[in-house]
């Protein structure tokens, strides 16, 4: 053994003695280096994310204009986690969560952990406590813009508090990022949009809360309404464009288009028809849609209704789309065992 190798072995032993077993290792020693995921609740978004859903143990930022569907996107993720037997928490800093709507999206409101904190510090401390417990699979913070520092709440209305919120977020994310990774929790931060004053060239839009969240996020999603979906003169929902602006786990800049229907959320039937047609799994002839020998209906809305009534055909098409894109969710079910193993390693 060379002197260099002996010195390295001694250093590794010293690190493990001081910081615990598993604090340093060769990457090849890790049994499973794949990124495990949880479905987003939208097949089109799973495809755009490139790995079949949200990566576990990472920070996700979802931002966009008002009423674009940001909270809907987050609630669908919560519903997916709960469906797989996981635990979800919603930190409602805006005090605006509609439990009736959440239930319609498939959220089990009886089991959902809900906090409506008074200050930004309180919200982030609650988030940290939940993450460090290792027992929560997803934490949603709605929204970063509503995380008001305690000093601002206790101060007078006209007082200046420059950079307070940015400092709060920066400090919180420094503490949270390691704990989120270790506990394999998905942390979704919903954010709003602001206009930068005096920008002549380039994009004047920015997100509140400073730059820290942009850096710490593994995935950033921009949610925008594209057009209204009408039936006659009645507006039934919006076609919404979700752009993957940043992605550390797959190629970025992919876009997903989904139908967000009022009172229903993301239309799974709509995206299956769109993706199926794109891949020629669903055939379109004129205005008629068909799958193999089965006619789905004339016009997109009729085809959507057919799939809603015939779940078996919908699942068959969905399976073919997932197979084509190689999407495989190895999500929540084995999380408890993984976290337990890591804790034993540390001990």
Curated annotation (Swiss-Prot):
Q: Name one GO cellular component term.
A: cytosol
Q: Tell me which InterPro entries the record gives.
A: AAA+_ATPase, DNA_recomb/repair_RecA, DNA_recomb/repair_RecA_CS, P-loop_NTPase, RecA-like_C, RecA-like_N, RecA_ATP-bd, RecA_C_sf
Question: Which Cys residues form disulphide pairs?
Answer: none
Q: Name the keywords, alphabetized.
A: ATP-binding, Cytoplasm, DNA damage, DNA recombination, DNA repair, DNA-binding, Nucleotide-binding, SOS response
Q: Which GO terms describe its biological process?
A: DNA recombination; DNA repair; SOS response
Q: Does the keyword DNA damage apply?
A: yes
Return one GO MF term: single-stranded DNA binding
In terms of PROSITE patterns, this protein maps to: RECA_1, RECA_2, RECA_3
In which residues is ATP bound?
64-71
What does the sequence similarity comment in the record state about its family? Belongs to the RecA family.
Which HAMAP family does the record cross-reference, listed alphabetically? RecA
Function statement: Can catalyze the hydrolysis of ATP in the presence of single-stranded DNA, the ATP-dependent uptake of single-stranded DNA by duplex DNA, and the ATP-dependent hybridization of homologous single-stranded DNAs. It interacts with LexA causing its activation and leading to its autocatalytic cleavage.
Name of this chain's protein:
Protein RecA
């Amino acid at each position: 053994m060379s002197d260099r190798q002996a010195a390295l072995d001694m250093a590794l032993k010293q690190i493990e003695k001081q910081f615990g077993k598993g604090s340093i290792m060769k990457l090849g020693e890790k049994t499973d280096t794949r990124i495990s995921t949880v479905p987003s609740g939208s097949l089109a978004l799973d495809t755009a994310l490139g790995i079949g859903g949200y990566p576990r143990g990472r920070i996700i930022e979802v931002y966009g204009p008002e009423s674009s569907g940001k909270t809907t996107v987050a609630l669908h993720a919560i519903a997916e986690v709960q469906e797989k037997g996981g635990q979800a928490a919603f930190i409602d800093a805006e005090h605006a969560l509609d439990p009736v709507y959440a239930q319609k999206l498939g959220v089990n409101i009886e089991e959902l952990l809900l906090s409506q904190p008074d200050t930004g510090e309180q919200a982030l401390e609650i988030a940290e406590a939940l993450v460090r417990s290792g027992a929560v699979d997803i934490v949603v913070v709605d929204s970063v813009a509503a995380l008001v520092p305690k000093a601002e709440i206790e101060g007078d209305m006209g007082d200046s508090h420059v950079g307070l919120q940015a400092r709060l977020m920066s400090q919180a994310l420094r503490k949270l990022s390691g704990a989120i990774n270790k506990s394999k929790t998905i942390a979704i931060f919903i954010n709003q949009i602001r206009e930068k004053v005096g920008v002549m060239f380039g994009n004047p839009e920015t997100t509140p809360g400073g730059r820290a969240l942009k850096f710490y996020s593994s995935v950033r999603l921009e949610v925008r309404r594209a057009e209204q979906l009408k039936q006659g003169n009645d507006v039934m929902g919006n076609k919404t464009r979700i752009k993957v602006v940043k992605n550390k786990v797959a190629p970025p800049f992919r876009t997903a288009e989904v139908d967000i229907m009022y009172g229903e959320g993301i239309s799974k039937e709509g995206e299956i028809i769109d993706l199926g047609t794109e891949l020629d799994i669903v055939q379109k002839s004129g205005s008629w849609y068909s799958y193999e020998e089965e006619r789905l209906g004339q016009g997109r809305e009729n085809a959507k209704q057919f799939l809603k009534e015939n779940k078996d055909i919908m699942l068959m098409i969905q399976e073919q789309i997932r197979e084509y894109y190689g999407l495989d969710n190895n999500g929540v079910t084995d999380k408890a065992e993984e976290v337990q193993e890591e804790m034993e390693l540390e001990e």
